[in-house]
Amino acid sequence: GTTEPLAQSAADTLATITRLNQIGAAGYTPAGGAVYPETTLGRTMRTSAALIEANNNASYNQFVEAIAIDVGGWDTHAGQYSFNNTTGVFTGSMVTNMTALAEALNAFYRDLIVSRGRSVTVVITSEFGRRVGENGTTGTDHGFGNVMMVLGSAVLGG
């Protein structure tokens, strides 16, 4: 081992990459008929599930304690939604983002929590707030309103 902090960080990074390659997330099979969407978030949640499952293998014990996923595209000052009166369907960036989030969370919940009984908690939040009211371009500007969602078997809704 080395005592140089940057050298140790580099060694830790290489060790993590080696472990990730050994896990082989690409070959992961979701449980319970869960289907992860073919979106960036869906693929990331599927990989996260693979890492959590590998953690339950004795050779990777205590490997995964927390996973952070950063998903962009939520800073929507305009075009969050539009409504088609003929079809009765909402479209727009917020609809697209919320659908992708819901589908990925549904697959993750079904795969790990319902089907495998894993004790996993998912926390969804933003690093900045929004104004509650819409601006003049069907968007919202930065403000003090925010949301936090928590999902897991030990979470009591409310």
Over which residues does each language-model region extend?
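Acidic/histidine-rich, metal-coordinating catalytic segments
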Residues: T121-G129
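Feature for exported/extracytoplasmic and membrane-associated proteins, marking the mature portion
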Residues: G1-E103, A107-S115, G133, V147-G158
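Phosphate-handling catalytic cores of nucleic-acid transaction enzymes
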Residues: H142-G143
